[in-house]
Protein backbone atom coordinates (compact mmCIF):
# COMPACT_ATOMS: atom_id res chain seq x y z
CA UNK A 1 0.00 0.00 0.00
CA UNK A 2 1.07 3.55 -0.70
CA UNK A 3 0.92 5.69 2.42
CA UNK A 4 -0.78 9.02 1.75
CA UNK A 5 -1.11 10.67 5.15
CA UNK A 6 0.77 8.50 7.68
CA UNK A 7 -0.68 8.19 11.19
CA UNK A 8 -3.30 10.89 10.55
CA UNK A 9 -6.75 9.40 11.13
CA UNK A 10 -5.19 6.13 9.96
CA UNK A 11 -5.76 7.23 6.37
CA UNK A 12 -3.91 5.87 3.38
CA UNK A 13 -4.35 5.23 -0.32
CA UNK A 14 -4.39 1.70 -1.63
CA UNK A 15 -2.53 0.48 -4.72
CA UNK A 16 -5.39 1.71 -6.92
CA UNK A 17 -5.20 5.21 -5.47
CA UNK A 18 -8.42 4.83 -3.52
CA UNK A 19 -8.53 6.61 -0.19
CA UNK A 20 -9.36 4.15 2.57
CA UNK A 21 -9.09 3.90 6.33
CA UNK A 22 -6.99 1.26 8.02
CA UNK A 23 -9.31 -0.72 10.30
CA UNK A 24 -6.28 -1.96 12.23
CA UNK A 25 -5.53 1.58 13.34
CA UNK A 26 -2.03 1.47 11.90
CA UNK A 27 -0.18 4.06 9.87
CA UNK A 28 -1.55 2.95 6.53
CA UNK A 29 -0.23 -0.59 6.83
CA UNK A 30 -2.98 -3.05 5.99
Swiss-Prot record:
UniProt keyword terms in alphabetical order: Disulfide bond, Ion channel impairing toxin, Nematocyst, Potassium channel impairing toxin, Secreted, Toxin, Voltage-gated potassium channel impairing toxin
Presence of keyword Disulfide bond: yes
Disulphide bridges, residue numbers: 7-27
Location(s), subcellular: Secreted; Nematocyst
Gene Ontology molecular-function annotations: potassium channel regulator activity; toxin activity
Record-stated family: Belongs to the sea anemone BBH family.
General function of this protein: Possible voltage-gated potassium channel (Kv) blocker.
Name of the protein this chain belongs to: U-actitoxin-Bcg2a
UniProt organism field: Bunodosoma cangicum (Sea anemone)
Amino acid sequence: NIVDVPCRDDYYRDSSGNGVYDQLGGCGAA
